[in-house]
Regions:
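Binuclear metal-dependent hydrolase catalytic cores centered on His/Asp/Glu-rich metal-binding motifs
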Residues: 134-156, 168-210, 220, 283
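Conserved beta-sheet core of the metallophosphoesterase superfamily
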Residues: 211, 216-291
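Active-site neighborhood of phospho(di)ester-bond hydrolases with catalytic His/Asp-centered motifs
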Residues: 57-58, 87-92, 121-128, 159-161, ...
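Membrane-embedded segments
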Residues: 55-146, 154
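N-terminal secretory signal peptides and thylakoid transit peptides that target proteins
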Residues: 1-18
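Beta-strand-turn-beta hairpins that frame and shape the catalytic cleft
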Residues: 43-54, 156, 163-175, 263-268
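Active-site-proximal beta-strand elements of phosphoester/diester hydrolases
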Residues: 51-61, 172-182, 211-214, 268-274
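C-terminal segment of N-terminal export signals and the immediately downstream linker at the start
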Residues: 1, 19-55, 74-77
């Protein structure tokens, strides 16, 4: 029999559950959790015997209280313990939402990144928020943006539509990168790209495998088969993700490119879940992550 006391207990239970879920999604998962996500595979056109470990740090969106400088420094210390040959910074260092109690200057973000240890180097690309956060770049319609200059001041090269040739154990490979596809704000929901995959790959002069850094995974649809692997961030895995589905994904392709290891037409893409938040400081089902990829 339904009683008033029973109804009140039920309502109280629902409210308590909602409060607990809200606290988890708005405080605990985005502000305190960190996982390491591992992938291991040999992509097409990969040199036999070439073993390479990539450590990806995507979308930190530094701002207090969820991603203060101290937390970024701890994440870097964790990344340094993962034994990466290369550490790749996939953009969006600037704050991604207005629900913050304090800002972190990009100069401080880059200075902390100088502590990253990787024998083959640390490389960066710009994210859309790095462009949006630079009023001068928006006015001129051109870079280099503040984040790129800050990284350069700390010895970190930004691969903005360019490529470099690297070697490990005498075996060569290329690392290329493109700028953001949503760099210049042209109006509500309208952006102008500064990504140029042709310019990035123009420097590739031999048949060594290519790893490409693209902030937005949508660029994957324009990546030629010549590229063995594309790595991206930007989506944060949708920030809300249940049973492999995210209701909102900042991609023209929705969940198709939201998160994880994606293989299409023999081409490989890994989309990191990233570290920070944008629009709202919320994460549920896709905690902040450091992404590790073992190739070969």
């Amino acid at each position: 029999m339904i009683t008033r006391r029973g109804v009140l207990k039920f309502i109280g239970g629902v409210m308590a559950t909602g409060a607990a879920l809200g606290a988890y999604a708005f405080v605990i998962e985005p502000g305190f959790l960190l996982r390491t996500k591992h992938y291991a595979f040999a992509p097409p056109r990969w040199t036999p015997g070439l073993k390479l470990r990539l450590v990806l740090l995507a979308d930190p969106h530094l701002a207090e209280p969820h991603m203060p400088l101290s937390r970024w420094q701890k994440i870097i210390a964790t990344a340094n313990d993962l034994g990466g040959d290369l550490t790749l910074l996939l953009g969006d260092y600037a704050a991604g939402h207005s629900w913050r109690t304090g800002s972190v200057p990009v100069a401080a973000t880059a200075k902390a990144a100088a502590a990253i240890e990787a024998p083959l180097g640390v490389y960066s690309i710009n994210g859309n928020h790095d462009w949006w956060d630079d009023r001068n770049a928006q006015r001129k319609g051109d870079g280099p943006v503040l984040a790129e200059r800050a990284m350069a001041d700390n010895g970190i090269l930004t691969l903005a539509n360019r490529a470099i040739r690297l070697t490990k154990d005498g075996q060569a490979f290329w690392l290329s990168g493109t700028d953001s596809m949503a760099a210049i704000v042209k109006g509500r929901g309208r952006f102008e790209s500064r990504a140029d995959i042709n310019a990035a790959l123009a420097a590739v002069t031999d048949d060594a495998p290519v790893i490409h850094m693209a902030h937005e995974p949508d660029l994957f649809m324009h990546i030629p088969e010549r590229v063995s692997l594309t790595v991206s961030g930007h989506t944060h895995g949708g920030q809300l993700r249940l049973f492999g589905y995210s209701p909102v994904v900042p991609s023209a392709y929705g969940n198709r490119l939201a998160y994880g290891h994606i293989v299409e037409d023999g081409r490989n893409l890994v989309v990191s879940g990233g570290l920070g938040c944008s629009i709202l400081p919320v994460r549920f089902g896709v905690p902040p992550e450091i992404t590790v990829i073992d190739l070969g």
